[in-house]
Design a protein with these regions (language model features):
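Surface cap/lid and interfacial helix-loop subdomains adjacent to catalytic sites
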Residues: 115-132, 153-298, 302-311
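Loop/turn elements at helix/coil->beta-strand transitions in domains of secreted/extracellular proteins
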Residues: 33-35, 84-88, 132-135, 161-165
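Positively charged n-region of N-terminal signal peptides that target proteins for export
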Residues: 1-4
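C-terminal motif of bacterial Sec signal peptides marking the signal peptidase cleavage site
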Residues: 16-17
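Gly/Ala-rich beta-loop-alpha elbow adjacent to hydrolase catalytic centers
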Residues: 140-144, 148
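Active-site-proximal beta-strand/loop segments in catalytic clefts of secreted hydrolases
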Residues: 40-43, 92-96, 141-142, 168-172, ...
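Active-site and ligand/interface coordination hotspots across diverse enzymes
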Residues: 20-35, 47
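Active-site catalytic motif of lipid deacylating hydrolases and related acyltransferases
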Residues: 40-133, 264-312
Length: 313
């Protein structure tokens, strides 16, 4: 069945006012979907000057260029990793800018936390008005990964029981985070209700502390192992075709990539050669799509065995 657009009947985007009661979403629905993927975008905006001459450190989704920046990533992630059995939801949120987060990294957490407040409001709206009793996958990249960690802590127990899995991509899950009952590290290919976390580097020395320096978990996004078992695969994206090997460093919990011959843009202010933060989704897009589908299948198999067919929030 061809993927179709949202229940609101727009061509690609749901255009609604940015407000607490009705957040603004990109929505792509599929009338055959049995699961939802709720995605939170990474940092796609830069500092800007308002009409009063002030430097602004948060995006403004009423500005077309800010909205377009998020749309570009969101649409790309939808097309790359969302299985045919999932509908896709992603909030347009007034995220912190790249300079606002990384020029002074002591501001990273408080500014991400402020932006995440909108994400939580959007998720609550999604659960109440758009979820329609579907199990759901959470996924966030970089700043969006921070939001996923905080959103996991925000879930009610009943909501947590309906989560297929959470993907924290290009960000860390700390020992403190793991003390929360909704955050449990993935151990294999198809366990459910778990949190998947990975950060990719050529070597552990290329890690960026503010993003992955304190991560307490990691999994290899090719073989989905938490052991140091190498996985060789073909990376074919953007005209590149390289044979790569992904190995989990069980001390740093980082994924070590060997064989990559291309370039990766350095993150402003904190970037290091050999850090593959800009490639966290392209490096593994085929494996991610397959893994999301596997975990969704496992979730629905469990629900069938439990004779549980609907959820109420």
């Amino acid at each position: 069945m061809i993927k179709q657009i949202s229940i609101f009947g727009v061509l690609l985007l749901l255009w609604t006012a940015c407000s607490h009661s009705q957040p603004d979403f990109y929505i792509r629905t599929n009338d055959q979907a049995t699961t939802d993927l709720f995605y939170i975008c990474s940092t796609e905006t830069a500092d800007w000057i308002n009409t009063q001459g002030d430097t602004m450190h948060f995006a403004d989704m009423t500005r077309p260029e800010h909205r377009a920046a998020l749309y570009s990533e969101i649409r790309g992630v939808d097309s790359l990793v969302c299985p045919e059995t999932c509908s896709f939801y992603a909030p347009y949120y007034n995220q912190a800018t790249i300079e606002g987060l990384l020029r002074d990294t002591t501001l990273f957490i408080p500014r991400c936390a402020k932006a995440t407040e909108e994400v939580m409001q959007a998720f609550d709206y999604y659960m109440q008005h758009l979820n329609h009793d579907h199990p759901f996958v959470l996924m966030g990249y970089s700043q969006g990964g921070f939001a996923v960690v905080e959103l996991l802590k925000h879930l009610t127990p009943e909501q947590a029981s309906c989560m297929v899995a959470a993907y924290v991509i290009g960000y860390q899950v700390t020992e403190s985070d793991l003390r929360h009952p909704s955050i449990r590290a993935a151990q294999c290919t198809n366990d459910i209700g778990v949190t998947i976390c990975y950060n990719s580097v050529a070597s552990a020395e290329a890690a960026i502390p503010v993003l992955s320096g304190n991560t307490a978990i990691g999994i290899n996004p090719i073989n989905w192992s938490t052991e140091a078992t190498p996985a060789t695969y073909v990376f074919d994206f953007g005209g590149v075709s390289d044979t790569l090997t992904a190995t989990l460093d069980t001390l740093s919990h980082l994924t070590l990539i060997e064989g990559y011959k291309g370039t990766c843009s350095l993150i402003p202010f904190v970037g290091k050669p050999g850090n593959y933060h800009c490639l966290e989704i392209p490096l593994y897009y085929r494996s991610l799509k397959e893994n999301i589908a596997l975990r969704c299948e496992a979730k629905h198999g469990m629900l069938k065995n439990d004779n549980t067919t609907s959820f109420r929030y």
